[in-house]
Swiss-Prot record:
Family assignment from sequence similarity: Belongs to the UPF0741 family.
Top-level taxon in the UniProt lineage: Bacteria
Designated name of the protein: UPF0741 protein BH3821
Record InterPro entries: DUF1450 (IPR009910), UPF0741 (IPR020880)
Residue stretches spanning the membrane: none
Record HAMAP family: UPF0741 (MF_01863)
Length: 74
């Protein structure tokens, strides 16, 4: 089963223009769903992504990518 990433295109702390290429590099076969994820509170302060239906957040994008690597299905 492939990995799934869900990101918000409206949250202030998430820059989808830089995040999407990094996610594609982690798993080129993953599904990427871009829309409101109803995670607005944390999304104002931290960069976040849902990875396989689990929220992953970090103060910046580089830290987020490191956390996402640990959540990926092999």
């Amino acid at each position: 089963m492939a990995n799934e990433f869900r990101i918000c295109d409206e949250c202030q702390a998430t820059n989808i223009k830089t995040l999407i290429p990094k996610l594609k590099k982690l798993d080129p076969n993953a599904t990427i769903d871009i829309r409101c994820q109803s995670y607005c509170g944390p999304g104002r302060k931290k960069s976040f992504t849902f990875v396989n239906n689990r929220p992953v957040a970090a103060p910046d994008e580089d830290q987020l990518i490191e956390k996402i690597k640990k959540k990926l299905k092999k």
